[in-house]
Amino acid sequence: MGTGYRTQALYIGSTPDPARRLAQHNGLCKGGARRTADEKRRPWEMVMVVEGFMSKIAALQFEWAWQHPAATRHLTADAPSKEQSKTHEGIEDDDAVKKPQQKTKGLTDSRATGEREDDGKKKTKRKPPARRTRTSLKAHLEDLHLLLRSTYFKEWPLSLRFFAADVSQQWRWLCGRVNESIPTHIKMVADGNCADTSPQCDHSLGVGSVREIGVDYTPIRDYLEKATFLLDDMRGSYCKICKEQYVDNDWAVVCPEADCTSTTHLLCLSRTFLDATEDPERLVPLTGKCPTCAQTVQWPLMMKELSIRTRGGRLLHNMLKKGGKRTRTIQKAQDATAESDDNASAADIAVDASHEDSDDTDSLIDYWDRILGSDSESGASIHSQYGSKASGTEVNIEKNVFLDNGLLD
């Protein structure tokens, strides 16, 4: 919103860095937009932010639809069309325009044929999008309300962040007037100088100002390190849902809970979350319960981690380099656990060996007396005893093999 001495001007744009973009609009750094370059409209103020888009393309789609409500296919125009709003005078003007067109009948056949050929060669130019006819703040908020309720955008994990109290108040007034409400998962955050105490607004997610909006991936660095460490070598790991081992180039996701190491196929988890919603029209889930820890996790957060891990490139390398100390700590903890398990196994082997070596301490005479003096019943019991011991060892070996292959927890 431009707050210069002229009438307040409104501008809708898209940016990955709100603080930098606001400085560009105010001429503090290179960049900006042509419509915000007028010094008489400066300084510009960012009154609200729609955030939570899954990609840059998604943000641009929403931006274009909000800028061109009369042309977008996501909105139904409330205003009557030109054909319905024509006055009697306008109809007469159209008839007057049509009359000269009848003179073309007097053209020669050759001239008419030439014009038709020229028209066939000309390429049809794409019409520019219809301009916005309403430019007030109220009109912009009404269009935003319609977009958030549209079939295409209502399933997106978006949130509204208000930095101006008057804009937040007008939005609440609009929501109270409209019969239909926006989806409940779309959050409203009262930030900046907003003193909104309504239950719809969340103050806990406030950052204070536009400059404090986080634009990097620092909040999910620990989550990214854990996922990269768990899926570094996918051989031997398996999906917690379908119980199948991963193969190369499998899309796997990791539970964002700090104490959970659950990994699943992307499609397996998506199908599980969608089945739990019982909504056949939903294509992308929003939340769901982890199959291992049963905690409710956010699908957009998991997709953000997956995108950085698979397409981050240098960004991923730098984040993991900064977090290398924590990764080494995790590795040491796992090594210590493995070492303790090895020590326990070695102790068990030593105990078994001590029992077996106890027979070697007997003298040769005692040994032959015990063997020759034993009857068939005692021999049968000895055979049964050693047979059961061998069976138990075999079961333990099979269990260890399954653990190595990742088939058991």
Swiss-Prot record:
Cellular-component GO terms for this entry: Slx1-Slx4 complex
Annotated region (Disordered), positions in chain: 76-135, 325-345
Zinc finger SLX1-type: from-to: 239-293
Entries under InterPro entries matching the protein: GIY-YIG_endonuc (IPR000305), GIY-YIG_endonuc_sf (IPR035901), Slx1 (IPR027520), SLX1_C (IPR048749), SLX1_endonuclease (IPR050381), Znf_RING/FYVE/PHD (IPR013083)
The keyword Lipoprotein is assigned to this record: no
Annotated keywords: DNA damage, DNA recombination, DNA repair, Endonuclease, Hydrolase, Metal-binding, Nuclease, Nucleus, Zinc, Zinc-finger
EC number(s) from the headed UniProt entry: 3.1.-.-
UniProt GO MF annotations: 5'-flap endonuclease activity; crossover junction DNA endonuclease activity; zinc ion binding
Biased composition (Basic and acidic residues): 80-90, 106-121
Family per record: Belongs to the SLX1 family.
Function: Catalytic subunit of the slx1-slx4 structure-specific endonuclease that resolves DNA secondary structures generated during DNA repair and recombination. Has endonuclease activity towards branched DNA substrates, introducing single-strand cuts in duplex DNA close to junctions with ss-DNA.
Oligomeric and partner information: Forms a heterodimer with slx4.
Protein name as it appears in the record: Structure-specific endonuclease subunit slx1
Gene from which the chain derives: slx1
